[in-house]
């Protein structure tokens, strides 16, 4: 019997929550701004 792994797909992750996707919308830009303010090392996936 094969195991189901819970590894996500990188392309899908990028398309949903990547930096360029975030920059497209007003709320996405707000997310980036908040994460910059908090000093996050990773702003987006």
UniProtKB/Swiss-Prot annotation:
Coiled-coil intervals, chain numbering: none
Name of this chain's protein: Large ribosomal subunit protein bL34
Pfam families assigned: Ribosomal_L34
HAMAP family: Ribosomal_bL34 (MF_00391)
Cellular component terms (Gene Ontology): ribonucleoprotein complex; ribosome
Region (Disordered): 1-27
Record field: compositional bias (Basic residues): 10-27
GO MF entry, a single one: structural constituent of ribosome
Gene Ontology BP term (one): translation
InterPro entries: Ribosomal_bL34, Ribosomal_bL34_CS
Family under the similarity heading: Belongs to the bacterial ribosomal protein bL34 family.
Originating organism: Synechococcus sp. (strain RCC307)
NCBIfam families linked: rpmH_bact (TIGR01030)
Keyword field: Ribonucleoprotein, Ribosomal protein
């Amino acid at each position: 019997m094969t195991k189901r792994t819970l590894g996500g797909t990188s392309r899908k992750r990028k398309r949903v929550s990547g930096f360029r996707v975030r920059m497209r919308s007003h709320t996405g830009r707000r997310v980036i701004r908040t994460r910059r303010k908090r000093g996050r090392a990773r702003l987006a996936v």
